[in-house]
Regions:
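Detector for methionine-enriched segments
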Residues: 1-3, 79
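An acidic-aromatic pocket/loop used at catalytic or ligand-binding sites
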Residues: 14-131
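Sec-dependent N-terminal signal peptides
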Residues: 3-12
């Protein structure tokens, strides 16, 4: 009985049984200006302009997502996509992918593009469903 209650309680903490709502960054993020929003098939991509370093941007994004979201092992297709974005933008790239344990069907792919010529960095936050 105690074990059953413990399992039920732990599942409730992660939101199992509730439909996880995909994050929406339409309002922007602290220290980053939303430039545009693209919707392509199963994903919504938010494009930001920021003066924040990759580390600071990631900290703000993680705080916005909440403590249950976890960084995931990178998939090869994400790494290839990020490398191409970096090459086309002439920028250094930092890639992180987050996933919520309650819903493995939603991933957040974050690409931070560090400009080689200054402090005008860009970030792309893609909310990917059904991956």
């Amino acid at each position: 009985m105690k074990m059953g209650l413990l399992v039920l309680f732990s599942l409730t903490l992660y939101g199992v049984g509730n439909d996880l709502v995909a994050p929406d960054f339409s309002e922007g993020l602290q220290g980053a200006k939303l430039e545009k929003k693209d919707e392509r098939g199963d994903q919504v991509v938010f494009h930001f302009k920021t003066g924040l370093s990759s580390k600071k941007f990631s900290a703000i994004l993680k705080k916005n997502l909440g403590p249950a979201w976890r960084a995931q092992k990178l998939k090869q297709e994400d790494m290839i996509f990020a490398a191409r974005r970096g090459r086309s933008a002439g920028a250094g790239v930092n890639l992180t992918v987050y996933q919520h344990p309650a819903d493995k069907g939603i991933r957040i792919r974050v690409i931070h593009l560090k400009s080689k010529s200054g402090t005008n960095h860009r970030a792309e936050v893609a909310v990917i469903k059904g991956d």
